[in-house]
A protein has these predicted regions:
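Elongated, amphipathic alpha-helical interaction scaffolds
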Residues: 37-49
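Positively charged, low-complexity intrinsically disordered regions
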Residues: 9-10, 28, 96
Length: 363
């Protein structure tokens, strides 16, 4: 270590302590010893730049009262680790309840069918404008690639608000069917739709695993020379399986809502999906793909999303490639908050998503 580097780190450490001391002196918690213990904040830094942080994250006043109430409800301790079967059972139960709520709030027509041999739900608006009947959206649900956390939860509101047909795809899940099985399923559905719709009249979107799969499908289509769709919705996307990002270290996905908890380094959830594929494969990890010529893309995340870093990094990559890419970051909310319809922020986010597809998926 050079003397200059040592001095710089010493100054950084001293500044950190001074800032923390000033904050503690001004914060109401410093008025009592019990509160002071609760609100202690500080940081130290290791030689390699790793930060050891204890911090205060107050309830933000910058979100809606509904969001404040909801965030407060997420403070209970995590449940014990679940088996895959338990996770799927719990996710299915939650999804059924939330899907029923989606259809109550955003009525649509629903037809269960298969497309290109893949199970799909066909959603159509109750009041379907004739001008929109040449457009279609493909929805890819979230759920960590090993369960279904949002097929109707995501597709129903967008169908209702955008007044565009949505095909929700039940792609094969890991670990029984690792990469590229899910990509193959969606590509098959997309190619089937190309028999009826022009590429520019098709949009693809999803949340979390569904957003990642959306990007993977686009990368595979581009690599194979298949015409790309007219628009992509990448809502909390994970485009790089080769390394964890800063926000993944700060926040961990705990159940569906997410909480402020450290990532468990002993649990590599990507392995079951990625299998033996090279983590730098440009389809598995689209951050390494040639993004030139990709369609207009909307990326949505939030400041307590474990995929905040991933989403913003992919947005920058798209911009570098000259893609028309928009990024919207919501304040203080966790991963996939737009699954929770009671939040005003959810209503805004869903409206933005619907408007994006109405604007970008050509008639």
């Amino acid at each position: 270590m050079t003397e200059k580097t040592s001095v710089r780190r010493s100054v950084l450490f001293v500044c950190t302590i001074v800032v923390c001391a000033l904050w503690m002196g001004c914060h109401p918690a410093s008025q009592g010893a019990k509160q002071a213990d609760t609100f202690r904040d500080g940081a130290t830094f290791e030689a390699d730049g790793t930060a050891q942080v204890t911090r205060v994250v107050p309830m933000p006043s910058t979100v809606s009262p509904e969001a404040q109430k909801w965030l407060a409800s997420l403070t209970q301790k995590s449940d014990a680790p679940q088996t895959l079967e338990q996770r799927r059972a719990g996710t299915d139960e939650w999804r059924k309840r939330q899907s029923a709520e989606a259809r109550r709030l955003y009525p649509v027509n629903l037809e269960e069918t298969t497309t290109a041999g893949v199970r799909t739900d066909i959603l159509t608006p109750l009041d379907w404008p004739r001008a929109n009947r040449e457009r279609v959206l493909i929805n890819l649900h979230g759920g960590g690639f090993n369960s279904d956390s949002g097929s109707l939860i995501e597709g129903v509101p967008i169908c209702n608000l955008a007044k565009i047909k949505v095909v929700s795809v039940y792609y094969r899940l890991a670990p029984e069917n690792p990469f590229p099985a899910a990509v193959d399923d969606v590509v098959a559905v997309y190619k089937e739709l190309l028999k009826t719709y022009k590429p520019r009249n098709i949009g693809i979107f999803g949340t979390s695993a569904g957003a990642t799969l959306t990007a993977e499908v686009a990368a595979q289509l581009a690599r194979s020379g298949t015409p790309l769709p007219g628009a992509l919705g990448l809502f909390s996307v994970h485009p790089d399986y080769s390394r964890p990002t800063d926000s993944q270290e700060l926040f961990a996905l705990d159940g569906l809502p997410g909480r402020l908890e450290p990532r468990d380094p002993s649990r590599p959830p990507e392995d079951a999906y990625a299998g033996n594929t090279d983590r730098h494969d440009p389809v598995l990890s689209p951050l390494f793909a040639d993004l030139k010529g990709w369609p207009p893309s909307l990326l949505v995340t939030s400041t307590r999303d474990l995929l905040l870093s991933d989403t913003t990094m992919f947005h920058r990559a798209l911009l570098r490639a000259g893609v028309d890419a928009q990024l919207v970051v919501y304040e203080a909310l966790p991963h996939a908050f737009w699954y929770h319809y009671q939040l005003p922020e959810t209503q805004e986010a869903l409206g933005l998503m619907a408007k994006f597809f109405d604007d970008k998926v050509r008639r």
